[in-house]
Amino acid sequence: MATVLTYVARRFAYEIDMLRPGDVEGHTVHRAVGTGFESNHLSGTAISVRPLFYPLGAQRGTGLSELEKVVVADILADCQGVIGWGGHTNPVKESHFQINVRPGDPGLARLARRIRGENEAPGSGAGSIDPFLPDRRRKAAAYL
């Protein structure tokens, strides 16, 4: 799980905006959550990227720009359904990304293996992806 969630944060940092210390929140033991999906932080299966910029319940259209949403859609498409995004939840929380499959799901293990392989190959993986290529845009369209 850590490999996949770190990949999401790295893609955000490389393709949307640089992240600073404190911009990513992951596992917590604080049981106070604003909505059900935030409880995924308790199990370490979710991260929030810049939660103060993109808070729970923010009005749609006030968070990420349309171009940034294209990047998020590409990240989701690249993760093949393993990652869920808070921009698709009610209430909205565009900073929220979570593992969207059950423990032991083979898709999670397959994705983590692929990411680890890309991390070892220069010129591939996070930091080398152009989410605006036509083929990638077509695949990501289902996640907008």
Where are these regions (language model features)?
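Active-site acidic/histidine clusters and adjacent loop/turn architecture
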Residues: 1-16
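A generic short-segment signal for beta-strand/edge and adjacent turn/coil regions
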Residues: 12-20, 65-68
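Catalytic cores and adjacent binding grooves of peptidoglycan-active enzymes
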Residues: 38-44, 55-144
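Mid-length scaffold segments of soluble, non-membrane domains
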Residues: 15-60
